[in-house]
Amino acid sequence: MDARDIILRPVVTEKSMNLMDDKKYTFDVLVSATKTQVRNAIEEIFDVKVKNVNIMNVRGKEKRVGRYTGKTARRRKAIVTLTEDSNDIKIFNDNKEN
């Protein structure tokens, strides 16, 4: 499996943006991905050294359309911590609004 198939997209929330200051980056990953696969994929794609990987499963939410109920797809998030001597991941511009 290719590394770009494992990492789906970065998670862009206020909390994940604040974690970037501590060299922690949040990504949506494949539901079947393991910590080792996520670590290897991040190191290959971004050319950084990974210190730790934390993974959490997010359940799908119930949604209604009229009288019909359904669920959104479940997903898996990975919070990747980089080593102190590693480079930052350049996902966005360095412009920060104050």
Curated annotation (Swiss-Prot):
Q: Which InterPro entries match?
A: Nucleotide-bd_a/b_plait_sf (IPR012677), Ribosomal_uL23-like (IPR013025), Ribosomal_uL23/eL15/eS24_sf (IPR012678), Ribosomal_uL23_CS (IPR001014)
Task: Establish whether keyword Ribonucleoprotein is in the entry.
Answer: yes
Question: Does the entry feature the keyword Disulfide bond, yes or no?
Answer: no
Q: Which GO terms describe its cellular component?
A: ribonucleoprotein complex; ribosome
Cite a single GO MF annotation.
structural constituent of ribosome
The alphabetical list of record keywords is: Ribonucleoprotein, Ribosomal protein, RNA-binding, rRNA-binding
BP-aspect Gene Ontology terms: translation
* Gene3D superfamilies in alphabetical order: 3.30.70.330
Which family, according to the similarity comment?
Belongs to the universal ribosomal protein uL23 family.
The entry describes its oligomerization and partners as: Part of the 50S ribosomal subunit. Contacts protein L29, and trigger factor when it is bound to the ribosome.
Query: What is this protein's function per UniProt?
Result: One of the early assembly proteins it binds 23S rRNA. One of the proteins that surrounds the polypeptide exit tunnel on the outside of the ribosome. Forms the main docking site for trigger factor binding to the ribosome.
Q: What is this protein called?
A: Large ribosomal subunit protein uL23
Q: Which organism is it from?
A: Lactobacillus johnsonii (strain CNCM I-12250 / La1 / NCC 533)
Gene assigned in the entry: rplW
